Amino acid sequence: MNFLPNGICFYLSVAICWFSSRVDASWWYMGTLGSQVMCDNIPGLINKQRQLCRQHPKVMQAIGAGIKNWIGECQHQFRTHRWNCNTMAREHNLFGRLLHRSSREAAFVYAISSAGMVYTLTRACSQGELENCSCDPGKKGSSRDAKGAFDWGGCSDHVDHAIKFTQVFIDAKERKERDARALMNLHNNRAGRKAVKRFMNLECKCHGVSGSCNVRTCWLAMADFRQTGDYLRKKYNNAIQVVMNQYGTGFTSAYRMLKRPNKNDLVYFEDSPDYCIWDHESGSVGTGGRVCNRTSRGTDSCEVMCCGRGYDTSRVSRTTKCECKFQWCCAVHCRDCQEEVDVHTCKTQS
Amino acid sequence: MAGAIIENMSTKKLVILGVILMLFQAFSFMVGGLIAPSPTAAVSYLATKCVDNEKTHHKNPKWFTPWGPDQCSKIKDFDEAMVKKIEANNIVFAIHIPPPNTEMSTWFQFLLLILHFDIAFKIQNQIADGASITIDVRLAYRDDKLSEWTQMAHSVEQRKLSCNFTAAKTIENEGRLYDCDLLPFMELGSVAHKYYLLNVRLPVNERKKVNIGIGEINDMRLVGIHQNGGFTKVWFAMKTFLTPSVLIIMIWYWKRITQMTRPPVLLEKVIFALGISMTFINIPVEWFSVGFDWTWMLLFGDIRQGIFYAMLLSFWIIFCGEHLMDQTERNRFSVYWKQVIPIVFGSFCLFIFDMCERGVQLKNPFYSIWASDVGTELAMAFIIVAGICACLYFLFLCFMVFQVFRNISGKRSCLPAMTKARRLHYEGLIFRFKFLMLVTLACAAMTVIFFIISQVSEGHWLWGGHTVQVNSAFFTGIYGMWNLYVFALMFLYAPSHKRYGDEQSSADQAGNSGEDTQLTTTITHVDGPTEIYKMTGKEAQE
């Protein structure tokens, strides 16, 4: 290939970054490459992941396109918190150094990213964008999978395939390394996958003679991804701090009085950093400059968000849309309204 | 009624026949449970949002394919459409049936599509009360992946939205999805082609209030339901086996009737008619659907089932009536018109309803009688009237059964005082009635129990290492059971060919004119009656 000079600089910088620091969950990075997914140029993928990437290029495109979805959900769930799931587009790692620490937030990000991949792949399968979803091609007209042939008894649900693929792809790297962090990631990834499955709704339709319930067919329908996000957020609130057991095969609660984690709980090892201050070592960017709510009593109140450092108030005049009339899909007619509001932002640390 | 085979059969033979029938019954359950897959399969489809850049509306529509070599240009969500200033009328939802690497098959028998909209909550764009969606839909097919699509159906339909928002309607909950009901979308009575394509538009017309107030639609989901090919093959094989079995017993039964010197009585005719309707439902006409695109097979199957059920219900009424031993009026169909009218009228209402639904779908597969207010009211009216007729019939049947049992207990107290010929006659009547009552109750109970199980359970059980398809077992088992019922009925209730004994002449001498009308034949046999028969007689004497 003939690289342009800026291309050469890009790949050199990628290589330098790759050698200089350990990278976690490098597949998140695929979203920043857009539709031009190049398996060999994503840093940090292990051989098995690279192999899957080459075998299923369309799956990789779908995964890359879906990253925006679960990051948006993460940012929605933490929009009023000191840590707001912010990403740094200019870093090769989406979340910077934050996830190097085995914290509660890392547990949540691993779980919701795993859930997001399942959700994305299920949607892509339902749209027909992926070819090998639940029926592998066999003889002509007789596609089959573990459940049997399509024309004999039908195939598995799309979500089952998505869960299997997600497990194989995401967990490949963690299974290669046998340390405590890998076990934590495996656990939280599985919790994320189970969270999606938890919100599959069984829906049934009666059909048959004169529409009676002579025949009734049921299927699993995927719920709104926000429900999964809400559920994982509750799991984050009740996450369990653990230590490795003496055999190195599982977890024990760090405090004897607390319960042992089950398969649906999120687990973490280290306490979270102080998100109030900017700290390069821990990856925290601090809350300086964040917008807060002066009248709130929750976590987005100025007192809590700004960590007691105070806030600045500025009067902003802005134009908003009002009296909107919507047409489905793509058109909206609004009047412009002028209003002045007070915006409160946290002071930066001194 | 003349003596039937069941009265003259020895206990040993009756038990042997029962065991054989039970074995066939168990076999028919196992065929469905172990060999066949589940009766139906459901596949989820998520519509792809295609952009129609053509500004002209030409006669031949362009077909938008969601995937494949000639796929359409797509948008991911409607924010993208807003940015590109694409209008609602240029958005086409495209669904390809079946998924990639699969083909539809004629063994699937029907294709039912159910529609579900993903509508996000927005404070300024909520779903209006009583909102309905106008859907402009085209259906096309092709038989190989390189052909052009051929249009099969086109319709503009309306569906009423019924959506709930369970969370609070605040700005924090914007983006959450409404909880919307499923909507009927399409039903094809045959699956004659390998690939189908749906192109759906939601046209917006502000002046006519078309698709205004329907909220923020994010996605359109469809679920495709079809009969599993394996189940169809097992079902066809079963029908093909059962047709000659019932046909042979029917022919044999008719020969027995015609061999007699007297004309057949009403009950014998009704049993024969029941056999005809069973054969009619058995004939595997569905084999033609594998080779021909006959969309009326579903409707034809419904009609055949309706005829059989009407005949079965009529048979039960007439069987009860003919066993009212003191009734002087009998052997004429006109005696039973009061009881038969609810059956005929109820069946007719269901037939009209089926014609309004499935009949119209022969022309327009997207039609649903539930989509309009008038249609819903008409459908409910027909169903309610049929339900009332069913209740009336049930009351009549219970009353007649009650009458027969009261008659039996009255007659039983008089049995010891009767002459031998009269006593044997009445004992035969009692035994025939009780036997059929017992078998009918068992079959009906089995049908109801399996219906309840199929509604409640998941559809398959794990038994040892095997997966047992309960729903398939239910279908093949119950179907086989009613065939065995009709078979046993025609065999056991065929007229006996045993010779009359010497008592006939003595009965003629001693009998009075009133009792003569009750005694059409007398019964004798060198082996004597069955043990059950003797016990009932002995019990009556005591």
UniProtKB/Swiss-Prot annotation, chain A:
Listed GO CC annotations: extracellular space
Tagged with keyword Glycoprotein: yes
The gene coding this protein: wnt2
Glycan-bearing residues: N132, N293
Known role: Ligand for members of the frizzled family of seven transmembrane receptors. Functions in the canonical Wnt signaling pathway that results in activation of transcription factors of the TCF/LEF family.
UniProt keywords, alphabetically: Developmental protein, Disulfide bond, Extracellular matrix, Glycoprotein, Lipoprotein, Secreted, Signal, Wnt signaling pathway
Gene Ontology MF terms: cytokine activity; frizzled binding
Post-translational modification: Palmitoleoylation is required for efficient binding to frizzled receptors. Depalmitoleoylation leads to Wnt signaling pathway inhibition.
Signal peptide bounds: 1-25
Lipidated sites in chain (O-palmitoleoyl serine): S210
InterPro entries noted in UniProt: Wnt, Wnt2, Wnt_C, Wnt_CS
Highest taxon listed in the record's lineage: Eukaryota
Locations listed in the record: Secreted, Extracellular space, Extracellular matrix; Secreted
Disulphide bridges, residue numbers: C74-C85, C125-C133, C135-C155, C204-C218, C206-C213, C276-C307, C292-C302, C306-C346, C322-C337, C324-C334, C329-C330
Stated name of the protein: Protein Wnt-2
A Pfam cross-reference name: wnt
Main location: secreted
